[in-house]
């Protein structure tokens, strides 16, 4: 019975200059890894589709088309897929195919309004999909693209200054040099101990990624610690200042995404954590904005 359902053709989808592009490795599903060529947001997507017949047989088909699709998928709800862009090109009208054929396609400056993203519970994908329509089962081939969106240097970039305090026990001031960082940037700051009347065991700074899906009241958030950096071990002295320097390059970071197509957001936070000798934790979080600079693609 399997013979009757095997595809009578091989379909090869090739993107122009694919071999010369930089690829992104990603985990498409748990345990299933893949890679995709990087495209810029305003770049034309073009290539070829090669259809080869098997065993010298002919192919009766109801048309051949290629689609460029941008979609958002909630991974905890497999059926919840939202398309935010779609372009279609007809490659062949219904008819008969007796030999191998190659078709060219071009989606000129096709709309790519968001950056590609695969998170814990949401995926934003761009797909080229070829469909050979038949009276029996359609033959479909897909290829993912990975889209980067580059930004200019922010016009404003404010100093972050906050404090952590417990009445008559602890007072700490800390500051970071700015609140917006490109993905290869360095976080520079300092922590100043004004009052210390508890036994401090250690102090850490963490980068937290918070992924939020949906809108209130049907909203779901997931937080993960990207990295944890211990900046102090042992009890500090009053008046002591501890410098902070964290290099972002090398961590799996994305730009900040805010309300993408009203479906999800991805935000980043710097979390200062202080642990005393009784393992009590005192912490303060501050949101930072991450953005992609053009030279990060080079």
UniProtKB/Swiss-Prot annotation:
**Pfam families, per database record:** Vps26 (PF03643)
- Offer one example of a GO biological process linked to this entry: retrograde transport, endosome to Golgi
- Asked if the Swiss-Prot or TrEMBL record annotates the protein with the keyword Transport, the reply is yes
State the GO CC annotations: cytosol; endosome; nucleus; retromer complex
Which keywords label this protein?
A: Protein transport, Transport
On the tree of life, the source organism's domain of life is Eukaryota
Family the UniProt entry places it in:
Belongs to the VPS26 family.
Complex and partners? Component of the retromer complex which consists of vps29, vps6, vps35, vps5 and vps17. Component of a retromer subcomplex consisting of vps29, vps26 and vps35.
PANTHER family, alphabetized: VACUOLAR PROTEIN SORTING 26 RELATED
What is the role of the protein in this entry? Plays a role in vesicular protein sorting. Required for the endosome-to-Golgi retrieval of the vacuolar protein sorting receptor pep1/vps10. Component of the membrane-associated retromer complex which is essential in endosome-to-Golgi retrograde transport. The vps29-vps26-vps35 subcomplex may be involved in cargo selection.
Official protein name in the record: Vacuolar protein sorting-associated protein 26
Q: Which gene does this sequence derive from?
A: vps26
